[in-house]
Amino acid sequence: MSTLHKVKAYFGMAPMDDYDDEYYDDVDAPAPRRAPVEDRRYPRRGERFADDAEYGYDEPGYRAGGPAGYADEDRFVSRHAPSREFDRPAPRLGSLRGSAPTRGALAMDPRRAAIFDEGSPLSKITTLRPKDYSEARTIGERFRDGTPVIMDLVSMDNADAKRVVDFAAGLAFALRGSFDKVATKVFLLSPADIDVSAEERRRIAESGFYSYQ
């Protein structure tokens, strides 16, 4: 087509059918179809499993038709299975030491047991509970023999209790002993050769030792 004919066709002076410019030759040609995104990303089912037959399952111990799957299941036991050794309870310390439980009155009051330790000045202590002033003589005899004496005057009336206290105080002074108050209406007479500390007197009062005698 000549240039003049192209100009005429452009301005409508010539029929468009005669205009066969190369730019319009492929207008009616169908565009190539692009494959969907899914088709490009994921292969077809047939293509994906086409070569599955090439991979066999001839591993030793595999049983294709059996219900259990593997014949030698013992080979696959976990190495980290819990051990039965940890289920056993730890032995009690008391059974290892082999010590028998303490029985008797000492087991009921440990503070009293400390007073009775061998070598303690209170190991031979005695407790007297006079009912009236006439029993003061027994207190004097025990104290004179070198025995520490606890006087429990709780059951006495105040008048007789005061007389016994005066007697015991004079006795302790005469024999160079000591006379101490342990609790209300409870007193301790100690010979000269026995020194009872304030801590020991406190322990006697706290433990109620005199009430066990």
From Swiss-Prot:
Stored InterPro entries: Cell_div_SepF (IPR023052), Cell_div_SepF/SepF-rel (IPR007561), SepF-like_sf (IPR038594)
Keyword Cell division (UniProt): yes
Chief subcellular site? Answer: cytoplasm
From the UniProt entry, list the residue stretches annotated as the region Disordered.
27-103
Report whether Cytoplasm shows up as a keyword of the record.
yes
Where is composition skewed (Basic and acidic residues) in this entry? Answer: 35-51, 72-90
Q: Which GO terms describe its biological process?
A: division septum assembly; FtsZ-dependent cytokinesis
From the UniProt annotation, give the residues forming the signal peptide: none
> What would be one Pfam family of this protein?
SepF
Q: Which UniProt keywords apply?
A: Cell cycle, Cell division, Cytoplasm, Septation
Residue stretches in coiled coil:
none
**Localisation per UniProt entry:** Cytoplasm
Any one GO CC term of the record = cytoplasm
Q: State the PANTHER family in the record.
A: CELL DIVISION PROTEIN SEPF
Summarizing the function annotation, the protein's role is: Cell division protein that is part of the divisome complex and is recruited early to the Z-ring. Probably stimulates Z-ring formation, perhaps through the cross-linking of FtsZ protofilaments. Its function overlaps with FtsA.
Q: How does it assemble?
A: Homodimer. Interacts with FtsZ.
| Family named by the database record | Belongs to the SepF family.
Q: What is this protein called?
A: Cell division protein SepF
Q: Which organism is it from?
A: Mycobacteroides abscessus (strain ATCC 19977 / DSM 44196 / CCUG 20993 / CIP 104536 / JCM 13569 / NCTC 13031 / TMC 1543 / L948)
